[in-house]
């Protein structure tokens, strides 16, 4: 098993993890029965981990969402089905590896699964562009969704990106147009769409595959109009204000559920999905099946109409005389 990567706020667990590893090595190298000591230490570590994760700040949740060992789109696909066939290419000369898709089945029901894909190490992240899709990636996604629409396949999307790639070439090749076209076309698809934020849900890069009948989020995932670092740099000219920006942006599942932006917050195992990926997979699979079963009973016209209404009610119109009230809610920079 790969060595666990602990986040900075998990430091109280470091010593316990070392002791657990030492006892496991002792058990492997000798015939000494250490099962009781191991059980006690693992129980203590689990209790402390649960205490830590019960009170995470939005900024800490971002760290969990970006955890390098957090289950990715491909991890969930492999948990859900063993007959998945990846489909490649945008039919315009490109095959973006940051956004993948293919056909598989869940409980003998054929579905299209597509999502952002990050790497596990530097080499993989270079290939996957750190999960930041280029215009070709969104065009590939649209091609696959149109294929699913043609063959009446429900669509499952997995969102995990800091945002769409913002390089010069991406802009020259129509990044904004590619995402906007996806938004427009997804509103008209006649098949159920269930989207899940499995890690980071960043800006337009997330929205490009996020127009769905049901939008789910894991407990420690985040969904935001801009990264807190970018927001802090814009508002306060100071990236160090990212924790304050994270709180102001309302990026957590709890906040977004209250605002009516998402439909369900999925619980995570103690310590986050990276501690028990299979448990996370079971939770997600059950939720997807529940929502798909409900959506498949709806007539096509009603499905499209409800999807349209879902997004039309988002946001709030505020009269000009209330602008000061809005600004008063934004944390101000202190000297």
Swiss-Prot record:
GO molecular function, one term: acetyl-CoA carboxylase activity
GO cellular component, one term: acetyl-CoA carboxylase complex
Localization annotation: Cytoplasm
Pathway assignment: Lipid metabolism; malonyl-CoA biosynthesis; malonyl-CoA from acetyl-CoA: step 1/1
Highest rank taxon of the organism: Bacteria
Disulphide linkage map: none
Keyword Transferase appears in the UniProt entry: yes
Residues in CoA carboxyltransferase C-terminal domain copies: 40-294
Subunit record text: Acetyl-CoA carboxylase is a heterohexamer composed of biotin carboxyl carrier protein (AccB), biotin carboxylase (AccC) and two subunits each of ACCase subunit alpha (AccA) and ACCase subunit beta (AccD).
Entry annotated with the keyword Acetylation: no
Catalytic activity: N(6)-carboxybiotinyl-L-lysyl-[protein] + acetyl-CoA = N(6)-biotinyl-L-lysyl-[protein] + malonyl-CoA
Full protein name: Acetyl-coenzyme A carboxylase carboxyl transferase subunit alpha
A matching Pfam family: ACCA
E.C. number(s) listed in UniProt: 2.1.3.15
Main location: cytoplasm
